[in-house]
UniProtKB/Swiss-Prot annotation:
Signal peptide: none annotated. PROSITE patterns: ATPASE_A. It is found in: Cell inner membrane. This is ATP synthase subunit a. Its main location: membrane. InterPro entries: ATP_synth_F0_asu, ATP_synth_F0_asu_AS, ATP_synth_F0_asu_bact/mt, F0_ATP_A_sf. Key component of the proton channel; it plays a direct role in the translocation of protons across the membrane. It comes from the Bacteria. Belongs to the ATPase A chain family.
Amino acid sequence: MTVDPIHQFEIKRYVDLLNFGGVQFSFTNAALFMFGIVAIIFFFLTFATRGRTLVPGRAQSAAEMSYEFIAKMVRDSAGSEGMVFFPLVFSLFTFVLVSNVVGLIPYTFTVTAHLIVTAAMALLVIGTVIVYGFVRHGTHFLHLFVPSGVPAFLLPFLVVIEVVSFLSRPISLSLRLFANMLAGHIALKVFAFFVVGLASAGVVGWFGATLPFFMIVALYALELLVAMLQAYVFAVLTSIYLNDAIHPGH
């Protein structure tokens, strides 16, 4: 049996839509799961907030807790003015969280294990920071790259560092989520092949497969924790970066 832990990330074309300028646009398994994840979030929130009561049920409690959790995160990171970005942060958090959790189900597809998806979300965040910063503050937004209280001879050097640091944000934001999801799913796949391979060796193999099996269970629990943690980290960093668009001064 050939172990191919990368096969689970393969993009498969289902329907060819159009060819524009030599670029083929297709409906793929990645698009299918992204539409499905958005549908899951939409229908859950619609169901949970339908017929709201003073004493909430489980679904309503989960929706309200999610709302308050992200709202507090945004207020703590960007102040009350940052609530203008609440829809963006909440949408990104729920999308990343549900994508990560759905990806743990066997024979599904993990969209956040693809760099193009995480990079698109990271560029959306940084693009929002830049556009909102210039719209609200004009050229004063450039003060974000000018540290206050530093000697004049160090200023050019520090401005370059600040610009490079700002431009590296979408890279680190996208790579962190992508790498964690990719590595975790590869590890799960490898240990799953160990279990199947050893179990096929007979009675002795069944005993040998016991340790990898329990390691898979432990890895699944760890991956579930990582899935939630990465969604939280992505949302926190998004809130912190958006704070720069509201308060660009150092």
